[in-house]
Amino acid sequence: MDEDAPVDESNEGIIGCLPSAVNIHHIEEIKELVDQLPIIFKLENECDETAAEVNYLRYSRLLHLYQEQPRLLDKWIPEIVANLVDLVTLIGIDVSKPRAMTPLSRESLKYLSDLCIVRGSKTIVRLLPHQVHLLDPLLQTLEYYETSQLSDHNQRNVLLMWLWIVVKNPFDLRRFDPTGDPDNVITRIMNVALHYMKWDWNSSQASAALVIAHCLSRTDGIPKVLSFLSRLLDSIKTHHENKKLLLADLILLLAILKHVDRRVLTGHIGTIHEQLSFLYPIDEKKGGLICKCLVKVVQRIGLIALKPRTCSWSYNRGKRLLEGMLDDNEEYSDEPSFSNKVNSNQSCNNEIDKENQWNDGDELENSEIVEFALMHVLEALSHSDTAVRWSAAKGVGRITVRLPNFDLATQVVGSIISSHFGEVAEYSSWHSHGACLALAELAHRGVLLPSLLEDIVPALELSLVFEDVMGRHQNGNQVRDAACYAVWALSRTYEPSMMAPYLQRLASALLCGALFDRQVNLRRAASAALQEMVGRQKNVSHGIPLIQSVDYFAVTNRQKCYEHLCVPVAEYSTYSAIILRHLITKKVVHWDEKIREQAAISLEKISEIRLENVSDDYYMEILDDFLKASCETRISPFLRHGYLLASGHLIKGLTSRGMDFSSKQTEIAWIPHILWPFCDMTTQPGALIRRTLCKFIQLVSASKKVLLLEKDKSEWLDVLLQLITDPREIIRSLAKTAVGEFVMTYLMNDEELIQKVKTRVIAAMTKCSDESERIGMGMICESLNSEAVDYEMFESLCNTILTPTSSDAKWALARQQTVFALNRISVNSSTETFNRIGQKCFETLYKAMTDYTTSANGDIGRFVREASMRAMSTILVDAKTEPPFLDEHVIKSAKYMVQQSAERISRTRECACACLKSLVKCEITGRCLPHIDLLMNIYSEPMDFISDRTVFQLKPLLDLGSEYYEQLILGIVVSAGGLAEGTQKTAKQLLLDHQREICENKPRFDHFLSTCADLFQRARKVNRIGNSFMQILPQIFGNLGIYEQCPETSESIIEMVDTMKTIAVRSSMMSRQRLSIDSLGELLNCGKKSTVYRSALTMILDTLNSQQPVLRKSAAERLYEHLCCAEESDDEVLEVLATTNWQDENDNVLKQAVAGISEKLIF
């Protein structure tokens, strides 16, 4: 046990979500949870099931935190196990108690089972009591479970493991049988275990097989081996079609072949081989688990047929620990010295002499059985299941290490290389994966002879860069991972002199894998293998600097590897050409688009620096090849994308250090013209090439060293104008960046092309049939120099928002882009220019703040409002304006932002808060804002406004009734009438609290009502705001305060009632008419002598005669509710309202009912 396990008394010992040290609080809590068990199960057959479940879940959660590093718990596990064992009462120990397992015992076994899962059964079972007297109670307990219907399989597994460790004791079994016959006890134990072999597959089967195998391995159990094996083999032959029974039999056979003495089984090996031969070759249809068991069976048959010996011919390195190697007197150097070379040659000669002696081994016994085992284990190396291949690889190593001479081992390795690498690997990744695992296992055991390295190393080099492009990509990942493991094993196995001829090749392949592999676990595997190689082999060039740069943790981030780590590594002359070749041949043409992009960036970063052994001509040749390949007609779109992207990045990287591209000017200029026919708008390959062209033009323009003729500029501009109006957002975004670079490089002084752009922009803004075209033209305006934007173009931008047409009413994204363009133009313009366009700009932005366009995606107008708020804050804070302009627009802009800070969309509220905060923080704009201290306190943290309940923070501003009152009321009303439940509740509650506070204060209440009436009148044409007001009207009319008895004395109330009537009468929307009925129902609470009451009652009675059944029913319900709560009510009217079917189609019945109600109520 680890007595010095690291303890973390803080909460900082965490890497990711895994602990790096034991948190002592976790240990204390685990112990406390175990101590709680007797309290929870205080009664014999009763317990608090909820408390027991909560206790167990917390215990399991704490334990599983250490699942990846269970050794951290070793210091405390013995105490925990002892405490749990004390709580277990086995049947038969106390004869006074009933023959049944108590709930406390079962729960304790369940806790022990979790410990087994986390730390491993072999570790935990050693800590269980081994006393001989426990045998009978364990047997009685397991026999009780045979008849039990409980589904506690984990607890039974713990009992079986406990029985196994007790059976291992070398005691005389006759003590436990009255007749003194040990066979009776063994039979009893085996019968108990055999019961669990019939279950469906779970861990109990393996434990039961272990118990049986150890019974047979005992001296008094050996006579039973023959008969038991005979029955087992007969059962396998009988049940080979039944997967459940076959699996159980194979697990039992495996346990017997492993644990029973080889000398006992040797005599029966021929029978076993003969009886099981019908199961081979392995049928993959039987399932992965059975196939794995069959592989294990055949390898153990082979192991029994061979003598267990340490082969004299196996390779023995000697020192395996790094401490011993570090004590070596040889000094590390990048190039081996002359003396090292001499020693290496002498070592090689010695090894050859040893090989001559190795042939003098014994002859192979049971050759037919061994050949049979090796043949099927080697076949299993190409099985489709990973677990089967892994088991087969271990089997190859175990069998080969027992072969009597090295010629046989050489044949095994030759078979692996010829059958699993080369052409066959191109069609199946399983072959390469299994072969790499097998080579690693052979190297571990020292049976992969140095003379075979010449054949092995090329195969491993190919496997380290293997890609299964046409299949499932994870298969290729497995091969590369296994290849890293194999190289790691080779590094640990061989002397530096043996590995010296191949060392640099393998180190270079590992370095490329550590830097450029797609998967993080494979980059880490390659890094670990490289570190092992540098540590154990002393001839890796620049080894120490390499493993410091390509560290296990440093390679975690792929972007960092491609953009940063590869550059200093490429500066080492040994690896410069290798890294470039790997990027060019493997990564630029990779199947993953993201890898191709990152490889191109790596080429740019590396080409920016001068490398010692890489000439500029080499780069030019690469560029020439890429440009030609990207223009070929019959080429994959993926390859075209990779080549063209790499060309662009190479151009940019090389021009940064002054390379001349005048010789390539024509080829580069013709790229867009040649590739445009491949830019189909309707296909994915076409979209890919469009994205690539955008990036290529951006990179070439950013280099600023590639000169274009006027004709070429015009063609490139035409291509960009097509790309920037693409319907796909990602292509427009890339084209926008490309246009920005293209304009800065080629159009700054070209009046003709700028005029061409202006004409296209004005035409698109004036008359356009596609939203994406207008978005694209807005992006171009954003990219142009502000001096190039004349007033005509600026006015055309503004008019798209100020004077929308029916065809572009839904184009919210186009208006958003227009606002972006206005923002950029205004910020970049001179003071003189802004004084000319400022008023028009803010008029447009205010109009944009009223954009509530909705679509299937919801409120898309919010994008326009958010862009407008950012534009207003940016322009005002930039302070290119005169004080009168600020005085006029700062407060007005702030009002709109206050309104948006109360609306229902969380991100819009956050944006409004951020914009207001910038206005408040700025000294120039802040002095124009009233109540700045209050604003600063409310809008201090934009992230807070994401929460729905943040609306309550606006109450001080609402109570103030200041300049922001009208916009704040509008924002709250829009939220209260929205569909989002969270903001709807909070906004309604805020408005209700405010109304109740002021309803007895006539001036303030009049101000509130007049504000609502004015906003309601103005918003009735905007569906969203009008609907919100209709939603909130019942609440307003239900709390009229001082106007409740005589509401007509308030002009604002009358105005809202009239507006509501107009909407209800003219609207064809059923929802609005139902909301008007709810509002009228609230008005019935007014004084009965008031005009408003009579008007509301009349309208409700008229609605009872409506043609719409839904409206009739709604009106009847509202009238019934009012009459039930009224001080005076007519029972006959209530009975008529309740009993009449208002959704009936019989007009006469309904008319009579309405006439009777009207006669009673109207006076």
From Swiss-Prot:
InterPro entries xref list: ARM-like, ARM-type_fold, TBCD, Tubulin_specific_chaperoneD_C
Gene inactivation effect: RNAi-mediated knockdown results in reduced microtubule growth rate.
Entry GO MF terms: beta-tubulin binding; GTPase activator activity
Official protein name in the record: Tubulin-specific chaperone D
Record family assignment: Belongs to the TBCD family.
Pfam families with a match to the protein in the record: ARM_TBCD (PF23579), TFCD_C (PF12612)
Gene name linked to the record: tbcd-1
Superkingdom of source: Eukaryota
Organism, scientific name: Caenorhabditis elegans
GO process terms (BP): adherens junction assembly; bicellular tight junction assembly; microtubule cytoskeleton organization; post-chaperonin tubulin folding pathway; protein folding; tubulin complex assembly
UniProt KW Chaperone keyword: yes
Function text: Tubulin-folding protein; involved in the first step of the tubulin folding pathway. Plays a role in microtubule polymerization.
Keyword entries, A-Z: Chaperone, Microtubule
GO cellular component: lateral plasma membrane; microtubule
